[in-house]
């Protein structure tokens, strides 16, 4: 008898149907010489410190560096304790009996790093010695399963992948346990969570938030000159910015008096915008968040459901390319979309056409190729599932369509010695951009079309306006932008090729990034504000402590991810990686243990409005660190305790938004904004009323 183990029951049922196993037993399906069984994700994992005889959080226990990791069944909370999950223990017993009876085991867990680890941990925990082979497939269609079973590989072919997965698991344990315990000991209270990937990700959110909220916008002016040629009117913006209306107004007057503008440069060129690459998981999550506001976790769950419904190929992929043999199947896949209400016409137009090969590269396909549809006709999908399916299908049509051809014109003009500029864009052939029919937004110095212009052309000045603008901070992170930052280990990369090159050294992997974000939400370190990600006071407090430590360094953590990739490819030894992680974790624990307990709950980042120094937030007050200034602002105003965010707004922007819940003397409450008076004391601001000073009274206990 052969035993096939899948990652979850639903996949086991599909495999059983293909091989003709139909007799349902407790925990497996039997028939035709097979027993098809399943895990429920990670049934087994590294044990907590208590398994090594280490109780509680004690300074002398750190760092905790097990020589050999103990594995134990998944635990669930029961009262105040964690106990082995009864369902997990039962299924492990079933697996043990099946493995002992089997001639060979076929591993059919997800074909990736975590799927490999799920099986290997079970195999190791059970002390099993039955030989095993690997089923490695990229979709769950009947054909893919049959072909995969005809081409199973020896399990040993994936030993390096397992070593990489185990190294990742152990590294997360070593860093997470030691850092979290060290911080809890230093703080002297509460439970704190730090992690190898979650902490630098939190740092990215906090850095952007503090940069955004402390930004002081600057107003500037640009001249907008109106002119025309051959009945085609257009406008050009001054290249210079002006910071006073007097200066800008004087120049505007001069321009109007001059009456004509001269072309000093007119260059036209044709460009071909290549179609976008196919989706990997992170790219899909980013676009789904930008387009529909879907969270990374929701998108992952949705594509997993589409995969199990045989509608798309393996979703947890990190590649945006396909190999040549898959490209050969593209005409049939595109033909399956001919009746699609949105993409049918475009898919039909590609029949017999020369398909773009930009996304075809055998060398850039690792474990799995980019996401594609399978050609199966979708049944009943939820509206949200349909949107995600259409994104994958639409991207497939885009990726193999012709380039978008544009004529780009760059024009420089001069009037009274003042330079102006305008850019024109005309789409000659929409190519792949026809698929979604989305219009590109024009930049402020861009026109949809320009008349033919030549050097030394003289045009009339038909008008000139002052356009008032403000400098803007970089926006708060959304899940989309944070996923991009994680992929690039915190670097701002716009170029697609540069992003591809950074993939192996990002924070986490495509399969784990959504879980990292959800961990930050569940720990209450970050929250959603519409689509923006905002750190909580707790998250800012943690960041304030670790921001200058290696554990918050995105690039350093990205380097560890690159090392894990090298272990998987056989280019690095797992033992060397483990020793490096142990040194790293020991350094982090030592640094955290040196943190002064009194600062463990502080939040810094606001600047002092009086001297420009650093302000530190305590439980009851905010104080300037500058010994000569020592500005103090009490947190409680009219029995209302201000949050860290409100204090930061008051100190950095000089005014808060409207705050509810201030106490009246007669027992009622009122709402008002707060500003600072000339002596830097909080003052109420009421709409249509004059400011009045606060009492700064403490909240009644």
Language model features with spans:
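Accessory interaction regions appended to the cores of large information-processing enzymes
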Residues: 17-23, 47-48, 54-55, 154, ...
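C-terminal or mid-to-C-terminal helical accessory/interaction module adjacent to the motor/catalytic core
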Residues: 87, 100, 142-225, 268-269
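Conserved short loop/turn motifs at secondary-structure junctions
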Residues: 1, 110-111, 188-193, 268-277, ...
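Amphipathic alpha-helical transducer elements in NTP-driven molecular machines
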Residues: 9-16, 33-36, 40, 59-62, ...
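Metal- or metallocofactor-binding catalytic centers and their adjacent structured scaffolds
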Residues: 243-279, 285
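Basic, low-complexity terminal or inter-domain segments flanking catalytic cores
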Residues: 2, 81, 88, 125, ...
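Intrinsically disordered, low-complexity regulatory segments
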Residues: 1-169, 173-175, 473
């Amino acid at each position: 008898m052969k035993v096939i183990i899948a990652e979850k029951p639903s996949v086991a049922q599909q495999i059983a149907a293909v091989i003709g196993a139909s007799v349902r037993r407790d925990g497996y399906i039997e028939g035709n010489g097979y027993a098809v069984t399943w895990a429920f994700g990670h049934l087994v994992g590294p044990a907590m410190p208590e398994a090594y005889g280490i109780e509680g959080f004690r300074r002398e226990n750190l760092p905790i560096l097990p020589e050999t990791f103990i594995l134990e069944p998944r635990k669930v909370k029961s009262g105040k304790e964690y106990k082995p999950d009864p369902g997990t223990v039962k299924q492990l017993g079933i697996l043990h009996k099946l493995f002992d009876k089997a001639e060979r085991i076929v591993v059919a867990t997800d074909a990736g790093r975590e799927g490999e680890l799920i099986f290997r941990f079970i195999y190791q925990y059970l002390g099993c010695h039955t030989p095993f082979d690997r089923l490695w497939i990229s979709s769950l269609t009947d054909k893919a399963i049959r072909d995969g079973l005809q081409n199973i590989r020896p399990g040993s072919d994936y030993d390096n992948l397992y070593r990489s997965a185990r190294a990742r698991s152990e590294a997360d344990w070593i860093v997470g346990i030691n850092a979290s315990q060290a911080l809890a000991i230093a703080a002297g209270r509460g439970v704190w969570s730090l992690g190898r990937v979650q902490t630098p990700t939190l740092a990215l959110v906090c850095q952007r938030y503090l940069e955004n909220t402390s930004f002081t916008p600057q107003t500037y002016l640009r001249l907008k000159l109106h002119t025309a040629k051959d009945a085609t009117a257009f406008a050009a913006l001054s290249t210079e910015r002006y910071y006073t209306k007097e200066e800008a107004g004087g120049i505007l007057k001069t321009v109007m008096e001059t009456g004509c503008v001269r072309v000093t440069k007119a260059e036209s060129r044709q460009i071909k915008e290549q179609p976008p690459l196919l989706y990997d998981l992170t790219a899909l999550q980013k676009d789904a968040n930008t387009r529909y506001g879907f969270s990374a976790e929701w998108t992952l769950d949705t594509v997993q459901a589409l995969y199990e419904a045989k509608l798309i190929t393996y979703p947890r992929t990190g590649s945006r390319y396909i190999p040549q043999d898959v490209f050969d199947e593209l005409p049939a896949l595109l033909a399956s979309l001919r009746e699609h209400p949105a993409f049918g016409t475009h898919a039909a137009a590609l029949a017999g056409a020369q398909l773009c090969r930009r996304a075809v590269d055998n060398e850039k396909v690792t474990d799995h190729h980019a996401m594609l549809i399978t050609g199966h006709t979708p049944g009943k999908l939820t509206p949200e599932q349909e949107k995600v399916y259409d994104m994958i299908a639409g991207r497939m049509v885009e990726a193999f369509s012709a380039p978008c051809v544009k004529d780009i014109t760059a024009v420089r003009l001069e009037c009274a010695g003042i330079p102006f500029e305008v850019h024109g864009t005309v789409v000659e052939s929409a190519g792949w951009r026809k698929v979604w029919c989305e219009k590109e937004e024009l930049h402020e110095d861009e026109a949809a079309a320009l008349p033919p212009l030549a050097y030394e052309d003289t045009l009339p000045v038909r008008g000139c306006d002052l356009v008032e603008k403000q400098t803007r901070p970089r926006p708060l992170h959304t899940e989309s932008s944070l996923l991009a930052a994680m992929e690039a280990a915190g670097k701002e990369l716009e170029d697609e090729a540069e992003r591809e090159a950074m993939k192996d050294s990002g924070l986490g992997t495509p399969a784990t990034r959504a879980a990292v974000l959800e961990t930050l939400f569940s720990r209450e370190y970050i929250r959603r504000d519409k689509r923006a990600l905002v750190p909580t006071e707790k998250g800012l407090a943690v960041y304030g402590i670790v921001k200058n430590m290696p554990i918050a360094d995105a690039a350093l953590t990205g380097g560890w991810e690159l090392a894990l990739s090298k272990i998987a490819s056989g280019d690095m030894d797992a033992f060397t990686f483990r020793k490096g992680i142990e040194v790293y974790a020991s350094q982090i624990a030592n640094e955290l243990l040196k943190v002064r307990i009194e600062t463990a709950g502080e939040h810094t980042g606001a600047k002092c409005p009086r001297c420009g120094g650093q302000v530190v937030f305590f439980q009851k007050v905010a104080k300037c660190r500058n010994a000569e200034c020592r500005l103090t602002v009490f947190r409680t105003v009219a029995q209302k305790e201000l949050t860290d965010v409100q204090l930061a707004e008051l100190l950095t922007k000089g005014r808060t938004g409207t705050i509810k819940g201030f106490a009246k003397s007669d027992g009622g409450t009122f709402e008002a904004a707060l500003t600072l008076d000339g002596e830097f004391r909080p003052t109420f601001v009421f709409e249509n009323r004059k400011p009045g000073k606060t009492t700064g009274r403490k909240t009644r206990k």
